[in-house]
Amino acid sequence: MSIRLLVALTLIGVLLQTGIGRADAIDGDWCSTDGMRMSISGEKITTPGGKQIRGNYSRHAFDYVVPEGEAGSSEIVNVILRSEYLAMSRQGPADSPLREWRRCKEGIS
């Protein structure tokens, strides 16, 4: 195998792995199985109730306090990325039910 081919294959492998790693982040538009929508961009979120607020962001998780005027006001919502296309959230205490979120097919307007 020539050195050029080996270098090219190595470079392609590195680029593919980098691209996959960047796609695996919680940022984006999310739709719940019960018709709710939210959008996360860094530390900003558009909540299911439509309010734009800030929360605590990490690459694979996000949490925020439910704003006034929305169901469960002042409760904490934790969102965890389970895969590139699946996230789970829990609002309130640890024994509260989980809500399933999937990446939306189109953006939130």
Regions found by a protein language model. Name each.
Residues 19-23:
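Sec/Tat signal peptide C-region and signal peptidase I cleavage site
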Residues 34-36, 46-47, 61-109:
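Beta-sheet ligand-binding and adhesion/scaffold domains
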Residues 43-56:
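Intrinsic low-complexity, repeat-rich intrinsically disordered segments enriched
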Residues 31, 42-43:
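N-terminal export/targeting and maturation segments
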Residues 24-36:
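Tryptophan-anchored aromatic micro-motifs
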Residues 1-5:
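Positively charged n-region of N-terminal signal peptides that target proteins for export
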Residues 7-17:
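Bacterial N-terminal signal peptides
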